[in-house]
From Swiss-Prot:
Catalytic activity, as annotated: a purine D-ribonucleoside + phosphate = a purine nucleobase + alpha-D-ribose 1-phosphate; a purine 2'-deoxy-D-ribonucleoside + phosphate = a purine nucleobase + 2-deoxy-alpha-D-ribose 1-phosphate
Assembly notes: Homohexamer; trimer of homodimers.
Protein name: Purine nucleoside phosphorylase DeoD-type
Assigned protein family: Belongs to the PNP/UDP phosphorylase family.
E.C. code: 2.4.2.1
BP-aspect Gene Ontology terms: purine nucleoside catabolic process
Record key words, sorted: Glycosyltransferase, Transferase
Function: Catalyzes the reversible phosphorolytic breakdown of the N-glycosidic bond in the beta-(deoxy)ribonucleoside molecules, with the formation of the corresponding free purine bases and pentose-1-phosphate.
Binding site for phosphate: 21, 25, 44, 88-91
């Protein structure tokens, strides 16, 4: 049954959904990597599609920017449409000098300056972590594809234009691999509602050096991340 934000029916979505922030990137992923694609959501322009990858039913849908937006969509997908696994596929900014542009980062955990998980966890700290099997499958898929993926913590920021530049020093000290805006929220939602989640990011810019990838480069390097996500789903089916 349709929700306020998703005009689909039970069965329209696969049990696994890849989720970029940008709905147009969701469309690109569906058209580039999936077969027999059909649109399953267009409310508020947040496009969602379902198709097959190597015969496996998979969905892809945008989640917007920030924890509030992605929390709405992931919650509804899990509780109203039977989704069991969510893989966020997005971009992140690097803060460590040993993390380079175009590196693929697998988010084993996610720190955050948001209070959303403390709200749902009775004002206590919640360890926002990815599902172990999904992490392992993504690592194995990356190796099989010849992609040297980094594995570690992300930082999910509430502010894109943050006034706190000193926080980047703290992130670097604690070994944070990349800064983005959603992983901690998605991991919290998955934990609350009994689903599994993973975030895979491509480093699109470096906060320290101010380097950035071009639009053309992002198209190519982001595809490596999508292939890892898709192949990891197939590996998960073999368990």
């Amino acid at each position: 049954m349709a929700t306020p934000h998703i005009n689909a029916e039970m069965g329209d979505f696969a049990d696994v959904v890849l989720m970029p922030g940008d709905p147009l990137r969701a469309k690109h992923i569906a058209e580039t990597f999936l077969e027999d694609v059909r649109e399953v959501n267009n409310v508020r322009g947040m496009l969602g599609f379902t198709g097959t990858y190597k015969g496996r039913k998979i969905s892809v849908m945008g989640h917007g920017m920030g924890i509030p937006s992605c929390s709405i969509y992931t919650k509804e997908l899990i509780t109203d449409f039977g989704v069991k696994k969510i893989i966020r596929v997005g971009s992140c900014g690097a803060v460590r000098m040993d993390v380079k542009l175009r590196d693929v980062v697998i988010g084993m955990g996610a720190c955050t300056d948001s209070k959303v998980n403390r709200i749902r966890f009775k004002d206590h700290d919640f360890a926002a972590i990815a599902d172990f099997d999904m992490v392992r499958n993504a690592v194995d898929a990356a190796k099989a594809l010849g992609v040297d993926a980094r594995v570690g913590n992300l930082f999910s920021a509430d502010l894109f234009y943050s006034p706190d530049g000193e926080m980047f020093d703290v992130m670097e000290k604690y070994g944070v691999l990349g800064v983005e805006m959603e992983a901690a929220g998605i991991y919290g939602v998955a934990a609350e509602f009994g689903a599994k989640a993973l975030t895979i990011c491509t480093v699109s810019d470096h906060i320290r050096t101010h380097e950035q990838t071009t639009a053309a480069e992002r198209q190519t390097t982001f595809n490596d991340m999508i292939k890892i996500a898709l192949e990891s789903v197939l590996l998960g089916d073999q368990e």
